[in-house]
């Protein structure tokens, strides 16, 4: 269940308070204290809401309230507390005896704000306006995902010098085409008798791909790559 209203709104006065209502409220609180604001209007003979009586007393009728304009010292205290607490007017009012939170808020919006702006200070950040614009205009530039290419070409593979008969390898002392095919290597040969390897490796930051391509100088030399190795590279 929701909280019941503090009064019957159909039988309460609204609008500006009259001098008679102010005096009746002051006399009752002086004699009986504040007490319960929900029952105070009926006890004081006022056709007002309890909340209206409380705000009227706190913001206007309290005897310890300060009257008149804010002093320069109060301005400095408000500015300093606002830089630390922000728009927490109740906490700021607790450091300024005799001033209400509503009064300080209105004074901030109508006077201090304009005063700070005239001096080139941002009332929200309490910094110079040019400095605030510089900080807010800084943009973090992400690293571009441009591919970085590394190319290795014309790499010569020296002939084997050790004889090997394992796994059906040639025993002639040199690396044969069949050996390279079994090892899954991509190659081409030229007229000099050397077996050359050409690698064109492309790397990227977001995703990378590698490909090994053989380019021959003669019409007979053709690039070849093991299908298993090619399938593995395509998955990367």
From Swiss-Prot:
GO molecular function: DNA-binding transcription factor activity; transcription cis-regulatory region binding
Keyword Repeat in record: yes
Keyword Transcription in record: yes
UniProt xrefs under SUPFAM superfamilies: Homeodomain-like
Compartments where found: Nucleus
Domain HTH myb-type: 9-61, 62-116
Gene induction: By ethylene, asbscisic acid (ABA), auxin (IAA), and Pseudomonas syringae pv. phaseolica.
Chief place where the protein resides: nucleus
InterPro entries: Homeodomain-like_sf, Myb_dom, Myb_TF_plants, SANT/Myb
GO cellular component, one term: nucleus
Region (Disordered): 159-181
Keywords: DNA-binding, Nucleus, Repeat, Repressor, Transcription, Transcription regulation
Polar residues bias spans: 162-175
Reported tissue expression: Expressed in roots, stems, flower buds, and siliques.
DNA-binding region: 37-61, 89-112
Subunit record text: Interacts with BHLH012/MYC1 and BHLH042/TT8.
Protein name: Transcription repressor MYB6
Native species: Arabidopsis thaliana (Mouse-ear cress)
Gene, per the UniProt record: MYB6
């Amino acid at each position: 269940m929701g909280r019941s209203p503090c009064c019957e709104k159909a039988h309460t006065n609204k609008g500006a308070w009259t001098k008679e209502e102010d005096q009746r409220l002051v006399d009752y609180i002086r004699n009986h204290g504040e007490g319960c604001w929900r029952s105070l209007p009926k006890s004081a003979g006022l056709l007002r809401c309890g909340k209206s009586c409380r705000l009227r007393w706190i913001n206007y009728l309290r005897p310890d309230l300060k009257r008149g304009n804010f002093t320069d010292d109060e301005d400095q205290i408000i500015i300093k507390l606002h830089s630390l607490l922000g728009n927490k007017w109740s906490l700021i009012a607790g450091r300024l005896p005799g001033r209400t939170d509503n009064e300080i808020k209105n004074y901030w919006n109508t006077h201090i704000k304009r005063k700070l702006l005239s001096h080139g200070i941002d009332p929200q950040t309490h910094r110079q306006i040019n400095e605030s614009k510089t900080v807010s205009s800084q943009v973090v530039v992400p690293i571009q995902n441009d591919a970085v290419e590394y190319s290795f070409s014309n790499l010569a593979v020296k002939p084997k010098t050790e004889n090997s008969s394992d796994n059906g390898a040639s025993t002639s002392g040199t690396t044969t085409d069949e050996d390279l095919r079994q090892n899954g290597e991509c190659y081409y040969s030229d007229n000099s008798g050397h077996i050359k390897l050409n690698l064109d490796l492309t790397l990227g930051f977001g995703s990378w791909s590698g490909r090994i391509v053989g380019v021959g100088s003669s019409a007979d030399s053709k690039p070849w790559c093991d299908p298993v190795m090619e399938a593995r590279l395509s998955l990367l």
